[in-house]
Amino acid sequence: MRPWTGSWRWIMLILFAWGTLLFYIGGHLVRDNDHPDHSSRELSKILAKLERLKQQNEDLRRMAESLRIPEGPIDQAPASGRVRALEEQLLKAKEQIENYKKQTRNGLGKDHEILRRRIENGAKELWFFLQSELKKLKNLEGNVLQRHADEFLSDLGHHERSIMTDLYYLSQTDGAGDWREKEAKDLTELVQRRITYLQNPKDCSKAKKLVCNINKGCGYGCQLHHVVYCFMIAYGTQRTLILESQNWRYATGGWETVFRPVNETCTDRSGTSTGHWSGEVKDKNVQVVELPIVDSLHPRPPYLPLAVPEDLADRLVRVHGDPAVWWVSQFVKYLIRPQPWLEKEIEEATKKLGFNIPVIGVHVRRTDKVGTEAAFHPIEEYMVHVEEHFQLLARRMQVDKRRVYLATDDPSLLKEAKTKYPTYEFISDNSISWSAGLHNRYTENSLRGVILDIHFLSQADFLVCTFSSQVCRVAYEIMQTLHPDASANFHSLDDIYYFGGQNAHNQIAIYPHQPRTADEIPMEPGDIIGVAGNHWDGYSKGVNRKLGRTGLYPSYKVREKIETVKYPTYPEAEK
């Protein structure tokens, strides 16, 4: 008897068992027709699992064929190795099937999640609208009307918090919360593997590279976003990002003295040819491309925010309320991995400040932004939203203390906040506020301070700030990497979220609207609206691109238009 014969019989037995498992799964799929609601929810996931099983079955078939060597001398060792590999693959398949059988749900459908978020947004927009209108009424008549208006606002707030609490529990029911947790983790790990693969090519001397200089003339948050923009272009054009950060205005030793290097194996920018950015197609044969700041970028590639990868879009829409922010956050996550000394510094600051949850993060930007990019907002404006969210948190958790992490560049604000709100516990480091002043801003101590502020703001349960500040937006982005979906965990006193240099932010009308005042614009379902901002009173401002008219429209009558781009998928990262 030839030595391969026993192995071949064993292979046939494995394939038979594999076929039986496929038949078993198929049988479950057929039986699920008796429960159409459950089947429709599970169908796409089951089909995906079956497709993977079929692929593994095909792999087994090819491995079996490689063992069928009818002529020539036989080497028993490789055959035994292949058999062991088959055994391991079969065991893994059995584990996958057992896990699948135990899993009662795999999350809800995309439409369910979109509707849930629409209800949530609609309730919030209704609240903003009623608050605004009733506050106007308070000034029209005497004390009686004012008292009734106050009571009505209080009752209305109670209703709104009840709706939001119910929606939260809806999002966690029937295993949906567990599914969202796992799906977000899987997506994050997938993207981080792809980035790591791109940043560490096998042969650095032959790799295509994109060079980015960190020293854009602006503050830390702005410079970090500059590097994120470079990274997204590098990822889209399949070029390894080379970050030039020597003589960084915050740390002369460069980025790597604070954060882990963006590359482990490829830090050299040298190449056979070098050129300035002239477009993905024109730069095809240029090995090293230098990228300008986004303000000077021409031509503009499709990889800029707010676009997301086409291959991930459907999964992202299901799991996250703002896929564009999630996508940006993945590059931030990779970039700000701390060096050991910084990690230790964060741990020590956490203990020293007594940072604990629940806590709401408040970022108050004064100094250079006020009067230029942002208006002045008193602490009372922030605390209204802090109080509202603590009342909401109290519906679903024990709130032992009402803690607020206060980050500001105004050293006098901490004392003011403590005086005006004695029932709150304010966590803050005034030395950071002093270091954030204009005269101290570009120092290593200032860098330490802004990193700590952003860290603690991102760790909060909710964020109240002005999105005109890059520090606030960075904290919000990092927050997305700490939760499956933290897209709604903020209130901005001014702008909606944006990324400097982004492409147009568009929405799609889902309800018709007829203007009641000259300030409003008409809409029909399907109209594309270029959004300029949310007034947080039930109305947003934008342009109806079909009509070319700019004005106000009810925020609840539109939905976000998700822009997708055919990014590379880096299959090599999975090998």
UniProtKB/Swiss-Prot annotation:
Domain GT23: 206-493
Organism: Canis lupus familiaris
One of the record's GO molecular function terms: alpha-(1->6)-fucosyltransferase activity
GO CC terms in record: Golgi cisterna membrane
Domain SH3: 502-563
Xref: Gene3D superfamilies: 3.40.50.11350, ESAT-6-like, SH3 Domains
Positions of post-translational Phosphoserine modification: 278
UniProt protein name: Alpha-(1,6)-fucosyltransferase
Residue ranges annotated as Cytoplasmic topological domain: 1-9
SMART domains assigned: SH3
Pfam family, one: FUT8_N_cat
Post-translational modifications reported in the UniProt record: Tyrosine phosphorylated by PKDCC/VLK.
Lineage of the organism: Eukaryota, Metazoa, Chordata, Craniata, Vertebrata
